């Protein structure tokens, strides 16, 4: 039994496939989805989605959004997403280092919030590209 997964950003369909298991970062923590999961609508945090297709795991960096599951159909609407295979590891590490420095040097509430979001995005991309299964 499988789940039909569809990940959509505002300007494109990021990914469509069948999956045996999905692990997501929701606003209330990590959640795992298996076939025949109860209907669910949840907000997603910036983080890595892990998808198992047959016995192979794949990582996707999600930049926040919503996930809905019903009748083994999972639809994920995100602000942006990148498959790990599309991320340059060197560029992801450089972006993470820069975001970490900016976060540590942030002054004031607005700058701290913006730096924190940039840091979370960079961290998600780096975790996705470095995921080992």
Curated annotation (Swiss-Prot):
GO terms for molecular function: ATP binding; proton-transporting ATP synthase activity, rotational mechanism. It is a peripheral membrane protein. InterPro entries: ATP_synth_F1_dsu/esu (IPR001469), ATP_synth_F1_dsu/esu_N (IPR020546), ATP_synth_F1_esu_C (IPR020547), ATPsynth_dsu/esu_N (IPR036771). One of its GO terms (cellular component) is chloroplast thylakoid membrane. It is found in: Plastid, Chloroplast thylakoid membrane. It comes from the Eukaryota. Pfam families: ATP-synt_DE (PF00401), ATP-synt_DE_N (PF02823). Its main location: plastid. Keywords: ATP synthesis, CF(1), Chloroplast, Hydrogen ion transport, Ion transport, Membrane, Plastid, Thylakoid, Transport. Belongs to the ATPase epsilon chain family. Produces ATP from ADP in the presence of a proton gradient across the membrane. F-type ATPases have 2 components, CF(1) - the catalytic core - and CF(0) - the membrane proton channel. CF(1) has five subunits: alpha(3), beta(3), gamma(1), delta(1), epsilon(1). CF(0) has three main subunits: a, b and c. This is ATP synthase epsilon chain, chloroplastic. It comes from Zygnema circumcarinatum (Green alga). The lineage of its organism: Eukaryota, Viridiplantae, Streptophyta, Zygnematophyceae, Zygnematophycidae.
